[in-house]
């Protein structure tokens, strides 16, 4: 019996970690198919219908690089293109993010902090939410963790030259994959550049009384400056990034085109006083700050206060604690830089989900603080952990309540449910949908009940796929006229009872009310052939 207990004790951390992963998977997959796909997911689902060259083209006129779409197409070849299948790729990267975070923290700290960090990530409302969405955010989070691990092994930790070389290669691959997946991933390597500059400056200051910021004041320390830059670009730091830049050359013309387009036309609202509070509130509770009550606000402020006080004390007592400041850098600097880059005269690009890569490091940072506090302030540490767990569990319940609600202005998408309502009336109904809503509806087209496009395609470049001949359009396809009747589903306030085809007359209408608050969401119009 003692031997069994001893073995169990040795395997306890492994069992705990498997329990954490299992819990995360249960939470994610329990409701992964509950919501109808919304526009961003629908764009992902639609673009993978094309070949790789066409995906490259249609991505180039949108706002993201193509790597995620390439992977999603390959994934769909094995697992299908249902909502469940497409979202499962994000769940896969969500799990990998937690696993990689565990091994990163175990390497730089210890097993106890690694388990707590994994636990925080497993119940993180934001990580759960975007592990259920057919978009690239969890893939970027995974690549960000991999990048930081590779950076640490290649340029911070004591390692053999062979290991350093291996991790430099992994770093190059991770950074390449990241910037070919989402542009804002670049905030992670930029944060590492800043950390490395300060890290080398501090080491040089310790040895030679060199101050990086005194150089910026143009003091005469030419030898020290030369030494700083020599150390900074040493260990193949510069050459590694030159390789990354070289491998990115094929996409640079498209990046420039997209950047110009985003500056001229983009949907993201300008920054205001609620931007940061909303980001913080969504991280903890998956709820905008304006919708929280006094108690939730108090919980968030208490957590933030503990983080700020601990960080300040850390700065005062251990100025050269590189590992803590590495995690702090990739937690905070991306948020700060994205905020600055979104200020006028630039177009705002500040969206919570774009910062998921930084938020996973915030969870790691909180785990580090919690365990370190436990060493001499147990009651504060326990309170800190309890508040985080409570906030995240509350956020998970909010996730379930808000299924089908986009964070883009609270837009509700239940097009799958509306289509099911039509098919309940007529099993093999021909259904027409216009505008960008077509992308979401097309996901639910089948051979018995086809989804068609009607009207003028959207003027934005993301509507180019609709303009393609691939898209079935009722005005251009004579086979559509074989239908004795058809249905149009449109947003409730933009329904038009005039038939888009002269061969049909309006017959009747139905309302589809959303399942969240009962308000009218879509108008369903029935047309019968003359």
Residue ranges of model-derived segments:
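Short, Lys/Arg-rich, polar N-terminal cytosolic tail immediately upstream
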Residues: 1-9
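Targeting/processing segments of secretory and organellar proteins
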Residues: 2, 205-206, 216, 221-223
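Membrane-proximal helix-loop-helix interfaces that form the catalytic/acceptor-binding platform
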Residues: 14-158, 165-203, 212, 225-528
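Conserved cytosolic catalytic headpiece of P-type ATPases
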Residues: 208-210
